[in-house]
Amino acid sequence: MRSMEDMSILVTGGGSGIGADCASRFCALGAKVTISGRRLEKLQHVQAQIGERCCIVQGDVTLAEDRQRMLDTCLAHGGGKLDALVNNAANMYRQPVDQYTEAFLRDAFETNVISAMMLSSAAIPHLEETTGAIVFIGSTHTKRAFPGASPYATTKAALEGLTKVMAAELGQRQIRVGCILPGAVSTELNLRAGLFSAEEASARYDSVAGLHALGRIGTGTEVAEGVEYLIRAEWVTGVALEVDGGIGLGVSHF
C-alpha cells in the first residue's frame, strides 16, 4: 500500500467529526492535510490539536470561488500537489415524504452532492499528476431505511452511484475513486440537524447501538481508518466500503 508520508490531502468539512478525525490520523501518518469548513473557530481548534501539518481554509463548498480557494490552499500547503480529496462536507437533511419542499431538496443536493461533484472535477488534473484518489463519505442510510431521512439517504445514494461511474471514467488516468458508508457515529451532524439535544445524545446512541452486529456505535477514527485504506490501496477503486459495525446486515435479535 502507498505510504501517506508527505501526501497532500484536502478534507472538506474538517472542523469536527469524521473530517477532523481524518485530518488527525493522516497528519499522524506524515501527510500534509488541508481542512475546510464554514466555521473558522472549529477549524482553528482542530489545527491547534494537530499542529503545523494541518492547514485550514474557511469556505462554503457550495460556492465555486470557495472551492477553488480550498484547492489552491491545499496545493500551496502540500508543495504544489494533491494526492487525495476527501469529500466529507455534508448536512443531515430530514423531511417527511408528504412535506417535501423544492427549496429544501435543492439545498440538500447542492450541499451533499453537487458541491462534491464540482470539487472532484476541479481536482482531477492535480490528481492525475499524482495518480491520486477521491473518497466520498456516504452513509448506511442507503442500506437501511430510516423514516424521515429520505432526502439525506437519496443524496448519499447519489454519491454511491457517482463513485462507480467516476471510477470507471478515471481509471485509465490512474485516479482511484471510493466511497465510505459509515454506520452510526457520534458527530455534531446529528446535533446540528436537531435530531436530538446534546443532553439526549448518549441515550439516543445507546438506543441505536443494538442495530449494529457489533453492538455499539462507531468512532470517527474508525471511519478515518477506512478512508485511509481507500487512499492508500493502489488496486482498489469503485467500491462502497461499509465501515458500519454491521448495521447494514439488518441484524434482528428475537
Locate the predicted segments by residue:
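C-terminal substrate-recognition "lid" of short-chain dehydrogenase/reductases
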Residues: 216-243, 248
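Conserved glycine-rich cofactor-binding loop
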Residues: 15-17
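Active-site loop immediately N-terminal to the catalytic Tyr-X3-Lys motif
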Residues: 98, 144-150, 172, 215
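Active-site helix of classical SDR
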Residues: 120, 155, 163
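Alpha-helical segment proximal to the catalytic Tyr-Lys
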Residues: 125, 168-172
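Residue(s) in the substrate-gating loop at a strand-loop-helix junction
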Residues: 139
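Substrate-binding pocket helix/loop in short-chain dehydrogenase/reductase
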Residues: 96-97, 104-109, 208
